[in-house]
Amino acid sequence: MALAHATYRRLLGPTWSPVAPERLRRAVGGKVVLVTGASSGIGEATSELLGRNGAHVLLAARRGEVLDEVAGRIRAAGGEASAYAVDLTDLDAVDRLVHDSLADHGRVDVVVSNAGKSIHRSLADTTERFHDVTRTNALNYLGPVRLLMGLLPQMRERGSGHVVDVNSLNVDLPAANWAVYTASKSAFDAWLACIAPEVRVDGVATTSIHFPLVHTPMSAPTYDPALPALTVDAAAQVVGRVLVTRPRLLIPWWVRLAAPVQAAAPEVSDAVTARFLRRKDR
């Protein structure tokens, strides 16, 4: 399995490979980096990676006791970390996070917007569960927007900063049974794309990473762990790389090829998917 995961990562190409540690230390050393969804998965691995490389990591997630454990590991390894228990669906709590992080540290240099809710459910199974739509949008779109609206002004005033959006290739290749999730992730991706030129004028970079499958606790209920995918540590290395290279967008090369085909012939794509779903339901 490890060989399959390593091969998968190599197939993504050099822009998805780990960056040299000394380059990462130069990019994040001494900076205050806020990571949402830091209690598990990509957020946890990213927080530990950045902590090892000189960043003061602000860990944000709902589970305060787990955040304390992550912060403890970062400190034990010689890094700096502060934990903030917050539910990003609670906009008042998001405002408190903005206030407390700036009051405690004076600034936030980088935001890694990683927290998210994945939901794999058909339209039929969602019809009586509209709360799935509202909660998923609250966590994947509204909460991150509120957070950045609070933190971007101080970045723009200083003339520096970086926002990294940990997103999904579902944004580029919409798939059946992923409507609620994909719509929420696409909304934040579009919002960030729209503000990117506005904040770039003031020295603030934005990066959207459209990840392929990553084996995380969030993906575990849906995907077989034997499927080739990125590990959370490999995904964290990708986040580390974009903090150095600062691209506007990072997506797998094969998505760049497939997305135009799907856009040019959506009827064909829909027909193939519908045929697959009919077979699956038999």
Spans of features found by a protein language model:
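C-terminal helical subdomain
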Residues: 208, 224-263
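The beta1-alpha1 cofactor-binding region of Rossmann-like NAD(H)/NADP(H)-dependent oxidoreductases
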Residues: 64, 84-97
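Non-catalytic terminal and boundary segments that flank Rossmann-like NAD(P)-dependent oxidoreductase
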Residues: 1-29, 273-282
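Active-site helix of classical SDR
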Residues: 148, 184
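Conserved glycine-rich cofactor-binding loop
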Residues: 39-40
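Conserved mid-core segment of classical short-chain dehydrogenase/reductases
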Residues: 118-134, 177
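Conserved glycine-rich Rossmann-like NAD(P)H-binding loop of the short-chain dehydrogenase/reductase
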Residues: 53-70
